């Protein structure tokens, strides 16, 4: 059973896109002035987190779904031109076909300029895939 989420005012994707571009440009400009790699990579994560949280909330995802960062992004290091690796965890395999908000969320990510690599799986499917594919296992571990 889904718990109702508190009402909120959805954010325009154009606003998220503009904020994302501005924050990225500022971060890269600071990096050029003072090249601290760790600050750049973690700053990219922070900026991306903010955008994803807004888009996730605005897409109306059910509360029994979960967004997980994997790969380098999950490790807390995101290169400026890297894709954002995500797993959308759903409660059961049937949920994938009935959750329209997954399509909304993924589309909004692309619309605002986040290049995402994503999969939609149950926890059980993650474990099964990780057992047969070392790249999935590594990505989940990161």
Which residues fall in each region the model found?
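N-terminal regions immediately upstream of nucleotidyltransferase
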Residues: 1-63, 81
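Short, functional N-terminal and low-complexity linear motifs
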Residues: 13-23, 71-75, 123-124, 140-142
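A sequence-composition feature that detects small, non-aromatic residues
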Residues: 18, 25, 29, 68-69, ...
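Hydrophobic/basic alpha-helical segments enriched in Actinobacteria
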Residues: 23, 40, 94-97, 101-102
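Preference for short coil/turn "hinge" residues that link or interrupt alpha-helices
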Residues: 33, 40, 66, 71-74, ...
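Solvent-exposed, flexible loop/coil residues
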Residues: 35, 77, 82, 120, ...
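Conserved catalytic core of two-metal-ion nucleotidyltransferases
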Residues: 38, 46-53, 59, 99-142
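Active-site nucleotide-donor binding segment shared across nucleotidyl transfer reactions
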Residues: 48-99
């Amino acid at each position: 059973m889904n718990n109702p989420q508190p009402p909120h005012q959805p954010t325009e994707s154009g606003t998220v896109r503009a904020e994302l571009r501005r924050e990225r440009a500022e971060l890269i400009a600071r990096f050029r002035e003072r090249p601290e790699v760790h600050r750049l990579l973690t700053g990219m994560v922070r900026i991306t987190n903010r955008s994803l949280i807004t888009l996730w909330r605005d897409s109306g995802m059910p509360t029994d779904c979960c967004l997980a960062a994997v790969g380098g992004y999950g490790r807390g290091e995101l290169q400026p031109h890297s894709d954002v690796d995500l797993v959308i965890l759903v409660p059961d395999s049937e949920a994938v076909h009935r959750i329209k908000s997954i399509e909304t969320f993924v589309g909004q990510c692309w619309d605002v300029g986040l290049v995402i690599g994503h999969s939609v799986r149950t926890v059980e499917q993650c474990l099964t895939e990780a057992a047969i594919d070392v790249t999935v296992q590594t990505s989940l571990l990161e």
